[in-house]
Amino acid sequence: MFGFDPSLITFTIYIFGMLLIGVLAYYYTNNLSDYILGGRRLGSFVTAMSAGASDMSGWLLMGLPGAVYLSGLVEGWIAIGLTIGAYFNWLLVAGRLRVYTELNNNALTLPEYFHNRFGSSHKLLKLVSATIILVFLTIYCASGVVAGAKLFQNIFSVEYSTALWYGAAATIAYTFIGGFLAVSWTDTIQATLMIFALILTPVFVLLSFADTAQFSAVLEQAEAAVNKDFTDLFTSTTPLGLLSLAAWGLGYFGQPHILARFMAADSVKSLIKARRISMGWMVLCLAGAIGIGLFAIPYFFANPAIAGTVNREPEQVFIELAKLLFNPWIAGILLSAILAAVMSTLSAQLLISSSSITEDFYKGFIRPNASEKELVWLGRIMVLVIAALAIWIAQDENSKVLKLVEFAWAGFGSAFGPVVLFSLFWKRMTSSGAMAGMLVGAVTVFAWKEVVPADTDWFKVYEMIPGFAFASLAIIVISLLSNKPEQDILNTFDKAEKAYKEAK
């Protein structure tokens, strides 16, 4: 297993490269602001690539291609919804959140921003929001651990229980050492590696056919064999089903690990440039992932002898294509892209979870006067604790990356998405409204499948839709029933809005 294996050598070089960046970032990390937000000094390119890489986890190279391989282009509605959601997140939220968090006592985390934005005399809002982050991000981290474990299990033929630790170890190490700067710098490299793999692989799958006519003919045979039209965007679904797939885009407004990239940018103007870079990267990556899943259908239909692994485990489709179509050295680089996707998102989520405990729980409730050095080291220790919990959740070998991501994505989108949007655009919003929105959104996501009868179409609706809608309604109703915010809060809101418009 550990002889002269080009894939192993490539992986090792890649991991050591990431660790080296972590060590370099260590020397730029002097205080908690550096560890959590990199001192708010990220440029447009790093912001764009870091936001993209921390967003598109192992789901991009495993979950989405696997879903398309299994069901066809109808799964592309997820990509359509995500693209629209990401664009409006950059357009509506990015610049405002950068300005508003800085003017609200230089808030370093979402819970701290909510607390400062609404001027709560008590810290219950911070406590509830930090708890929601820990619950859903730990589940989200588990999806990254599962993706990494399946990669190591496939490549090196080790037991899943062993692969869990291999997949998580490198990510934990450079996040522990370097904090936000390490995560952002490595994200930039990893985003480049991901787009390289996602463009190259579908092209080589197509080139494996004599011409497009042969490709089309084999695809038609594959469709006839299962009586399914893989190229139909509307096949085997309902309007509610399509809405559920497209509703993934709503989740962007509430993802802490993505919003942190906006907060860390050096200026609003750099965010405008970053939006163009990030959206271009995202469209190419999603198109490549869909292409991998779709083109793999006729490829493996024409080669049934090598299709066993993919037919049993569709999420392995990219891994199998990389191993089959490329020499071991190139395959090792391409497969490192999966590790890159896993590491980039997992590291971002570990850091947000760690900062939530350090800044919002420890400094907020236990030791308000803790030194910067103490807080940074506590943050590092919390990275280890959250990672251990994620590994424990990921113990089930049958866990699906897409399902874990789907649940956590809905949780954040419903609990935080409406609160973030209303906090930036409606100054009449109150702390009671924010609290109601968070709780209603989070509870809806957990309760939807338990309350709605399984034999109805509503059971199949993605939890994001009712969660986002009910949370928004709760914010409006409770805010209007509450006393108006204090004048200082209204003045800060106006000041932030003015600063944002001047900074554009």
Curated annotation (Swiss-Prot):
InterPro entries: Na/Glc_symporter_sf, Na/Pro_symporter, Na/solute_symporter, Na/solute_symporter_CS, Sodium:Solute_Symporter. The keyword Oxidoreductase does not apply. Its main location: membrane. One of its GO terms (molecular function) is L-proline transmembrane transporter activity. It is a multi-pass membrane protein. Keywords: Amino-acid transport, Cell inner membrane, Cell membrane, Ion transport, Membrane, Sodium, Sodium transport, Symport, Transmembrane, Transmembrane helix, Transport. The keyword Membrane applies. It is found in: Cell inner membrane. It catalyses: L-proline(in) + Na(+)(in) = L-proline(out) + Na(+)(out). GO terms for cellular component: plasma membrane. One of its GO terms (biological process) is proline transport. The chain crosses the membrane at residues 8-28, 50-70, 73-93, 127-147, 163-183, 189-209, 240-260, 281-301, 324-344, 374-394, 405-425, 434-454, 461-481. Belongs to the sodium:solute symporter (SSF) (TC 2.A.21) family. Catalyzes the sodium-dependent uptake of extracellular L-proline. This is Sodium/proline symporter. It comes from Haemophilus influenzae (strain ATCC 51907 / DSM 11121 / KW20 / Rd).
